[in-house]
A protein has these predicted regions:
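Short linear loop/turn motifs
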Residues: 63, 71, 167, 209-211, ...
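Short, surface-exposed acidic
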Residues: 160-164, 203-207, 268-280, 317-325
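Sec/Tat signal peptide C-region and signal peptidase I cleavage site
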Residues: 21-27
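Pocket-lining segment of extracytoplasmic ligand-binding domains
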Residues: 89-90, 99, 171-176, 181-271
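Bacterial N-terminal signal peptides that target proteins for export
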Residues: 1-13
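Short, glycine-/small- and polar/acidic-enriched structural segments
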Residues: 27-179, 183-190, 209-211, 216-217
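Secondary-structure end/capping motifs
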Residues: 232-316
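Conserved C-terminal helix/tail region of periplasmic/extracytoplasmic solute-binding proteins
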Residues: 302-342
């Protein structure tokens, strides 16, 4: 009886101690993460990381919100409202040019090749960059692809004076192309392509020119964080990056499963269309030869430096950042953990 009483006392004591320590020892740090766009195919990997408990395993209680472009995402990080955002590194380069700007950095590159593209219908007869001369190009002023237009023009020998630029809104960009009000548009390749397919345009009638394949060495979207926050919270940043890259690795291995995670958050989507959109992002923007060789998440700092020079062809720097001002690899997992085997 004494043994039983002693065991009961010890058990109750242990449970009491566990109850006292649990909130501290197992507390999850709240994290807000903003995307650059809606919950569509390319957002699926983050929900994979969420559903598989990768963020939770790092002690992070992550909330994922939609966005409205990289400029908004970067401003959200700069304001401190979000600890992490997914945004375009080229937009960040321009943002960092301001001396008073928050010292935001990319800590994991996701789109090794940016989705910036010139999209047209085949009836317009635009098969190469020079064919844009004499045409009307529909481009939203805030579009990330349009921001690269000066460098694209220079690299491809286009006479910009012969191209009429029509400032169009994001919602009417593809409709105006379908209606023939513009001859071509700037945009993200997978978004514009899927929007046109959704409007009944046949696959063979859509022509996409990826700027990455036509002379631009730019990178695309990555995970952005305030460097001051990162310095104060290195384990949080390391954990978030590690969990996010695991989500991407799993999503690449099982894209249909990834889309199933996405559909839980946006059930009005067409899962077949989002699968195609996601596969386009994987094949065109994520799984480049560089990523297959070196793993996901990193960058070539020399290429990044060259990309900053290319941005300068259409943007007048007053305080041009260096590559090391823009990307910090110190929070990445070791290369074997970032390898893509597909």
């Amino acid at each position: 009886m004494k043994r039983r009483a002693l065991f009961a006392t010890l058990t109750l004591g242990a449970l009491s101690l566990f109850a006292t320590l649990a909130p501290t020892a197992f507390a999850q740090t709240p994290i807000k993460f903003a995307l650059d766009w809606r919950f569509e195919g390319p957002a699926a990997p983050y929900f994979v990381a969420l559903d598989k408990g990768y963020y939770k395993a790092e002690g992070l209680d992550v909330t994922i919100d939609t966005g409205n472009g990289s400029t908004e995402a970067i401003n959200r990080a700069a304001s401190g409202a979000y600890q992490f955002v997914f945004g375009d590194i080229n937009t960040l380069v321009r943002f960092r040019d301001k001396p008073e700007s928050k010292k935001l950095k990319v800590v994991a590159m996701i789109y090794d090749a940016p989705p910036f593209a010139i999209v047209s219908l085949k009836k317009a007869g635009i098969s190469k960059p020079k064919d844009l001369e004499g045409k009307t190009l529909g481009a939203p002023a805030a579009d990330g692809a349009y921001a690269q237009w000066p460098a694209f023009v220079k690299k491809n020998g286009i006479d910009a004076s012969k191209v009429k630029i029509e400032n169009v809104g994001f919602p009417v960009r593809e409709p105006m192309l379908v209606e023939g009000k513009v001859d071509a548009i700037t945009g993200f390749s997978f978004s514009s392509y899927m929007n046109l397919r959704g409007r009944g345009i046949a696959q063979d009638d859509i022509h996409v020119m990826l700027m990455r394949n036509l002379g631009l060495e730019l990178y695309g979207n990555g995970i952005i964080v305030d460097s001051e926050y990162a310095a104060k919270n290195p384990k949080i940043v390391q954990g978030f990056v590690r969990a996010t890259l695991k989500g991407w690795q799993d999503a690449i291995a099982d894209p249909k499963g990834a889309i199933a995670s996405l559909m839980k958050r946006n059930s009005i989507l067409n899962d077949g269309q989002e699968f195609v959109r996601f596969k386009m992002a994987i094949d065109q923007n994520v799984l480049t030869p560089e990523v297959r060789a070196n793993g996901i998440g990193g960058v070539d700092m020399k290429r990044l430096a060259r990309s900053i020079e290319q941005i300068g062809e259409g943007f007048k720097f007053s305080n041009k950042p260096k590559a090391e001002d823009i990307f910090d690899a110190s929070y990445l997992p070791a290369k074997p953990e970032r390898t893509i085997t597909q």
